Amino acid sequence: MLKKNEIVTVEIVDLTHEGAGVAKVDGLVFFVENALPGEVIRMRVLKVNKKIGYGKVEEYLEKSPHRNEELDLAYLRSGIADLGHLAYPEQLKFKAKQVKDSLYKMAGITDMEVPLTLGMDHPVQYRNKAQVPVRRVNGQVETGFFRKNSHDLMPIEDFYIQDPVIDQVVLALRDLIRRFDLKPYDEKEQSGLIRNLVVRRGYHSGEIMVILVTTRPKIFRVDQLIEQLIKHFPAIKSVMQNINDQNTNAIFGKEWRTLYGQDYITDQMLGNDFQISGPAFYQVNTEMAEKLYQTAIDFADLGEEDVVIDAYSGIGTIGLSVAKHVKEVYGVEVIPEAVENSQKNASINGITNAHYVCDTAENAMKNWLKEGIQPTAILVDPPRKGLTESFIKASVQTGASRIAYISCNVATMARDIKLYQELGYELKKVQPVDLFPQTHHVECVSLLVKRS
């Protein structure tokens, strides 16, 4: 049995779905960060139990030709870019394999062709939103990212996958917090004022929203701070404050205040204008979200006689994108602010055939059935936990001929596809889409068609 700190030579034979290298020694499976298939390394044993262990690269004896040697390892250690050490064309293959493997493991599907993941020409600096903790490190106020699996802040100035203008705003805020002597949050002591900085920037519009997440309402000289900030970044249209006084990992608390401008910014997606509020869900990679949604729309093959249900509708991005091409759209979202955004966004774009309710998706589906609404197509874009069994059964009862499923977790998507197949639907096609280059996350669109 290998012991902690022992060093052994191993070959990496696979990658986990989270991008860790896999090695096998004496019947044990070891997970090794920053190691790629085909590499031979000297591995230090960090931790070992009866079946699995964790190791660390001490030395590379043979490196993979697919290794990205230019990656700053801080991005790997923080989890900002946990797949950044793998060359981008190989990342796209890896993500397609994740989809194929999940369909096999969770749904027993072996014959589905999974095309190459749709990728980006410029797979960095794509994120339109930053959520950055503020802490004191070595006596200095810093912004950055937590080291993976910890709450130790690593000061970072260039976030690699974020819009560089957002990085500049974060650094300007950090410098102003230092200058105005505002106290950063101390998690252990439950003290300090500034917990997090959240910055959004419209991909097409360039409009910027800044959110100061604080432990209490009063921010000393906040008007002067905002004045200085806007002097450098006139594209700022909104400065919000969110008050979170709880001992929690959640970014936002319940109370919101508008400190400057309006409580939203505007951006465009697939030809529509969208108002995006502070807490609203909006895909962080606009360029690829447009490809993701267009793929779902194309899969569903929608026409002017179609009645469409848009489940987990967010601020209406996908439902309003299809509304101009179909008869009616019925959307449901559980977050009240997002439903208000959807209704406003429909109005802004002159769309009168899209109707939104605030409810759980399964409740709304049952109510629409009672009202005699009969959808021909359903678009679903659930959170990572996927669909509930009751939602799936309710959606089947509508008799919709096709379901386009947008997933941010291919394991739960495959699980849900299995149930849909048992209830009379057939998986026709899938398409992975890379919304999160340099990370292990993959989005996927699948099309389910009702068996005749």
PLM regions with names:
Residues 58-69, 73-184, 204:
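Extended interfacial segments that mediate partner engagement and assembly in macromolecular machines
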Residues 115-123, 187, 196, 432-435:
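Short, solvent-exposed loop/turn elements at beta->coil junctions and helix N-caps
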Residues 21-26, 144-147, 211-213, 342:
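Short, acidic/hydrophobic/Gly-rich beta-strand patch recurrent on exposed beta strands
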Residues 1-74, 355-356:
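Terminal RNA-binding accessory module
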Residues 2-9, 17, 217, 221-452:
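Rossmann-like S-adenosyl-L-methionine
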Residues 153-195, 216-240:
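Internal alpha/beta scaffold segment
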Residues 198-202, 208-218:
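Carbohydrate-binding surface patches
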